[in-house]
C-alpha cells in the first residue's frame, strides 16, 4: 500500500470515528434527536471495517493512525465546532505527525 493510499485511508478512518462519536455527543449534550444514533452506529461500524484494510500489525496501525486522528480532530474543532486552535494545539499536531512518520517510515 502506498504512503498516499495509507494516509488517505487514515483520514477517512478518522472522519468515520469522529462522526461516530460526535453524533451521540449531539444527542446527549445538545438535544439532537435519538435518530442520530443510527448514522453514528453506521459510522463506527465503517470505522472498524476501515481499520481492517491496513496491511500491517494492528498495534502499529493504531499508533500511526493516532497522529492523523489528532490532526483531523483539531481540523474538526475548527471547522465544525468553530473554535480556532491555539498554537499549542498546532504544536501537538506537529509532534503527533512526527511520531506517526517515525512509526510509518522506520526501516523494518
From Swiss-Prot:
One Gene Ontology CC term in the entry: plasma membrane
Domain of life: Bacteria
TM region(s), chain numbering: 3-23, 31-51, 63-83, 87-107
Compartments where found: Cell inner membrane
InterPro entries reported for this sequence: UPF0060
Membrane topology: Multi-pass membrane protein
Transmembrane helix keyword on record: yes
Family classification: Belongs to the UPF0060 family.
Database matches in NCBIfam families: PRK02237.1
Protein name (record): UPF0060 membrane protein Sputw3181_1172
Protein source organism: Shewanella sp. (strain W3-18-1)
Lineage: Bacteria, Pseudomonadati, Pseudomonadota, Gammaproteobacteria, Alteromonadales
Amino acid at each position: 500500500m502506498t504512503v498516499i493510499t495509507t494516509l488517505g485511508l487514515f483520514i477517512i478512518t478518522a472522519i468515520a470515528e469522529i462522526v461516530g462519536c460526535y453524533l451521540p455527543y449531539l444527542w446527549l449534550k445538545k438535544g439532537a434527536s435519538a435518530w442520530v444514533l443510527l448514522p453514528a452506529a453506521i459510522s463506527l461500524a465503517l470505522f472498524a471495517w476501515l481499520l481492517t484494510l491496513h496491511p500491517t500489525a494492528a498495534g502499529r496501525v493504531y499508533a500511526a493512525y493516532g497522529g492523523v486522528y489528532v490532526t483531523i480532530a483539531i481540523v474538526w474543532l475548527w471547522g465544525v465546532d468553530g473554535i480556532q486552535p491555539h498554537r499549542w494545539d498546532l504544536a501537538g499536531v506537529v509532534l503527533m505527525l512526527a511520531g506517526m512518520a517515525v512509526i510509518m517510515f522506520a526501516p523494518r
